[in-house]
Regions:
Chain A
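Active-site-proximal specificity loops/subdomain of glycosyltransferases
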Residues: 95-151
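Short, well-formed alpha-helical segments that are part of the catalytic scaffolds
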Residues: 68-86, 98-106
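Conserved catalytic core of nucleotide-sugar-dependent glycosyltransferases
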Residues: 143-147, 154-156, 160-239, 272-277
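Short loop->beta transition adjacent to catalytic acidic/histidine clusters or analogous donor-positioning motifs
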Residues: 57-59, 82-92, 113-115
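C-terminal catalytic/acceptor-binding lobe
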Residues: 1-41, 216-278
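A conserved hydrophobic helix/loop-capping motif in glycosyltransferases and polysaccharide synthases
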Residues: 54, 59-70, 93-95
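Phosphate/oxyanion-binding active-site loops and adjacent basic polyanion-contact surfaces
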Residues: 70-71, 126-134, 238, 242
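Short coil/turn segments at secondary-structure boundaries
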Residues: 30-31, 73-77, 103-106, 118-120, ...
């Protein structure tokens, strides 16, 4: 009997150790989950907060850039904006015959998720300065992104200013959406300024009021689905480049989504060329 | 005997449960520590990384700002820079008769640590546009900061561009330190361009080369201790405002600390005034 009782103690001991180990493993896994969640979520003063970051649609921010004295300053400033944005991939298209080491080194040090593209713009024969670089990014998306991907494209000039709140508007985009842009088209805010049920009921337009969708490049976003539905749509050499591009994707003032048009969330700022003597 | 053996099993059970609970408590506490650490440290893509954030010297970023079309755009962009900087307090001094609701609302929404000051600049009788606003911030520090505080002041114009790395240079400041500034004084980089053992051995200067410390406002930081040693030092209405201020605090080209002078970490960028028709 004593032998069996001793065995019972041993078995009980082994069972306990087993249960304890399993319990510890479960706890560890759960706590790891918490750590992981917190890592991506809890930087309240530094990032946009989202409950479930990985389920957010990806934003492809497309930026054309060209060599000039203020280039790295502009890219530094813009990178500090997009560093706050989760689920963001930066498509930087250089106006150059090959990647410059200046921009390559800058991107490499940035820790951002990015793709460095390059193509030479044709400045002598056109109205729009950065046609090739913009179309290069569209080409890259059509070649490298799955048509079923839940992703949205947004064109971000390197000298513009973007409120972090604009990225929330971008992520609401189902097919194509718009919002007002500050200091554009001769106005304090150009674009939709009154909206109802997701549509614009009033637009603020001064320059070329006949445009189909009168909005600055910083004032719209398009879901990649639409790019695959209209596989040849691209930017053309027109002064109303944004409107013509949106029209070629099937958008007009009535069907473009306008969820928010109260405050300005993006500004068409421009930087002075510095006077350098050396 | 069987009774005692049963008791043994019970005692063993209780002991195991107790040990398990203690183990779980210890594990929980340790993991909490990890979580807490990670919260403040691991946002590698969004913040400067510092091992022990709370022991860092505080940075007082001092920004003069005035009403104009691009004001909120500039403040938005600058706020996105300083949002990445730990242990930072923003002293924003408005050039106004009272706090404007535009700036107050902006700061209130920003989640930053800030103090909103105001004073009217006297634009009609001087060279320097923002003399009163700058001195107002110095006055606030001398009145509200303990002389023993480990804090450093840095003047950040709202249209300039700041690499996040400049804040590492600022925090090295023992009494007063300097670094080169991009696109300033007619040069691609003005200020110390060769340094050795914490001192500048060569300066790059074009405009007014006779200045005692030839550096732009974005190119120096001063420990608050020094402000209390020289309690009357302030900005005066001089074109070489930075140099005269640094001189009044006891600095010259030889005793100002220069730890790093290889890359440009701050740029004197300027924004174009937009053409608005309305």
């Amino acid at each position: 009997v004593a032998y069996f009782e001793k065995m019972k103690v041993k078995i009980a001991s082994i069972c306990f150790v087993g249960i304890v180990l399993i319990g510890l493993l479960i706890l560890r896994q759960n706590l790891n989950g918490v750590i992981h969640k917190r890592n991506t979520m809890v930087c309240p003063d530094t990032r946009l907060e989202h409950k479930d970051e990985k389920n957010l649609p990806l934003i492809y921010g497309i930026t054309s850039t060209y060599k000039r004295h203020v280039q790295i300053a502009e890219l530094t400033r813009l990178s500090q904006t997009v560093m706050h944005v989760p689920m963001f991939h930066w498509l930087l298209t250089e106006d150059a015959h090959s990647k410059t080491s200046l921009v390559a080194d800058f991107l490499n040090q940035s820790k951002l998720s990015y793709t460095h593209l390059f193509i030479k713009n044709n400045l002598t024969s056109g109205i729009v300065k950065d046609l090739n670089t913009r179309n290069n990014a569209l080409h890259w998306i059509r070649k490298n992104v799955q048509p079923s991907t839940n992703a949205i494209i947004y064109f971000m000039d390197d000298d513009n200013t973007y409120s972090l709140r604009v990225f929330d508007e971008i992520r609401k985009t189902k097919r194509g959406s718009a919002w007002p842009v500050g200091l554009a088209g001769g106005l304090l805010h150009e674009g939709p300024i009154e909206c109802k049920d997701g549509k614009a009921v009033r637009w603020n337009v001064h320059w070329w009021p006949q445009r189909t969708v009168p909005i600055d490049m910083a004032g719209f976003a398009v879901h990649v689905n639409v790019l695959f539905e209209k596989p040849t749509a691209e930017f053309t050499d027109r002064p109303d480049i944004e409107s013509v591009f949106l029209e070629s994707l099937g958008f007009n003032r009535d069907n473009i989504e306008v969820n928010y048009c109260k405050d300005v969330l993006a500004w068409h700022t421009q930087t002075k060329a510095p006077v350098i003597v050396e």
